[in-house]
């Protein structure tokens, strides 16, 4: 099917319409509004063990779930409640000190209107996001932020586009205010995202990734040939020279191997003659991965050999492991 219109022109118009709505919404925060009162309300709720319950139906339900996810990721207790399910038992999830945010662009959603009276009966404070303070829903609520827009960005001015973008943005406004009020830090964020890059930088330690088995350990008297076999089998690009007490003596790196081959060293030669003796080693297993990476890059080595206070080999960590995690010094 041929496309008989300019996709780029539509893309430009959609983004301009949505950007304009966001900029116009700034105006509501340049005159008296409920934002500060809402932030204080949520903070007081949290102090008393409560949470922010966010309600929406249709597209607003999906936006509500995203706002819940953002709140949780920044240390703010939150939960999504579907209004229909609430009327059939899920209302029990709304606890004594909870605050409720109800999202409805038009503010006339019957599902939400039916739920409001039950929430008010239980003495819950209601925040509303709608297009007008005169909507039925906002009249029943206690606090209000505006979703007013000039038009939806879709070609027929009907599908939720600009309105859902603005709703997401207002959710971000609440989240940002709560973060600032609680002095939420990068360390706090990382604690809620241990699997993310920041979490790895701030929380994962050397001992958490240390390889302690199947190590390429060889004696200083090992032949060049046998050392190459050991390096090939263990796939770390190096071999570790240890004495009978398992104390670190040296490291045979791939660079040592290349230099030996260029010099024509016999495969029968003992590796102690051309390996790196008294290599750099690492003792602090409680160090963060970023510190380990900085150590490797500072000394221009690829294998972090970890030893105890008696210089006995405990395990290794390879530079590639850290780089694969996305770490950068």
UniProtKB/Swiss-Prot annotation:
Single Gene Ontology MF annotation: isomerase activity
Domain SIS: 38-184
SMART domains (UniProt xref): CBS
BP-aspect Gene Ontology terms: carbohydrate derivative metabolic process; carbohydrate metabolic process
Pfam families assigned to the protein according to its UniProt record, in alphabetical order: CBS, SIS
InterPro entries reported for this sequence: CBS_dom (IPR000644), CBS_dom_sf (IPR046342), GutQ/KpsF_isomerases (IPR050986), KdsD/KpsF-type (IPR004800), SIS_dom (IPR001347), SIS_dom_sf (IPR046348), SIS_Kpsf (IPR035474)
Binding sites annotated in the UniProt record for ATP: 56-61
Keywords, in A-Z order: ATP-binding, CBS domain, Nucleotide-binding, Repeat
Entry keyword Disulfide bond: no
Domain CBS, chain residue ranges per copy: 211-267, 270-329
ATP-binding as UniProt keyword: yes
Gene3D superfamilies membership: CBS-domain (3.10.580.10), Glucose-6-phosphate isomerase like protein, domain 1 (3.40.50.10490)
Similarity annotation: Belongs to the SIS family. GutQ/KpsF subfamily.
UniProt-recorded name of the protein: Uncharacterized protein HP_1429
Species of origin: Helicobacter pylori (strain ATCC 700392 / 26695)
């Amino acid at each position: 099917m041929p496309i008989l219109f300019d996709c780029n022109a539509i893309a430009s118009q959609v983004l301009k319409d949505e950007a304009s709505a966001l900029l116009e919404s700034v105006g509501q925060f340049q005159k008296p509004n409920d934002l500060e009162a809402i932030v204080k309300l949520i903070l007081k709720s949290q102090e008393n063990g409560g949470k922010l319950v966010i309600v929406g139906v249709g597209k607003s339900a999906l936006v509500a779930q995203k706002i819940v996810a953002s709140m949780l990721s920044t240390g703010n207790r939150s939960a999504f409640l579907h209004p229909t399910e609430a009327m059939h038992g899920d209302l029990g999830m709304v606890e004594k000190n909870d605050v409720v945010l109800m999202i409805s662009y038009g503010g006339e959603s019957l599902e939400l209107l039916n739920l409001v009276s039950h929430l008010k009966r239980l003495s819950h404070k209601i925040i509303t996001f709608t297009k007008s303070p005169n909507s039925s829903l906002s009249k029943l609520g206690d606090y209000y932020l505006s979703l007013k827009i000039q038009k939806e960005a879709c070609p027929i001015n009907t599908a939720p586009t600009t309105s859902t973008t603005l709703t997401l943005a207002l959710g971000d406004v609440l989240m940002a205010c709560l973060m600032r009020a609680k002095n939420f830090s990068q360390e706090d964020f990382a604690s809620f995202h241990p699997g993310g890059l920041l979490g790895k930088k701030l929380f994962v330690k050397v001992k958490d990734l240390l390889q302690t088995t199947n190590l390429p350990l060889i004696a200083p008297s090992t032949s060049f040939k046998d050392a190459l076999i050991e390096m090939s089998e263990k796939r770390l690009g190096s071999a570790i020279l240890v004495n009978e007490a398992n104390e670190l003596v040296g490291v045979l790196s791939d660079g040592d191997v290349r230099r030996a081959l260029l010099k024509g060293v016999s495969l029968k030669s003992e590796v102690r003659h051309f390996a790196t003796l008294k290599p750099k080693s690492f003792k602090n297993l409680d160090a963060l991965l970023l510190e380990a990476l900085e150590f490797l890059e500072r000394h221009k080595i690829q294998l972090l050999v970890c030893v105890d206070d008696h210089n006995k080999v405990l395990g290794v960590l390879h530079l590639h492991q850290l780089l694969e995690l996305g770490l950068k010094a």
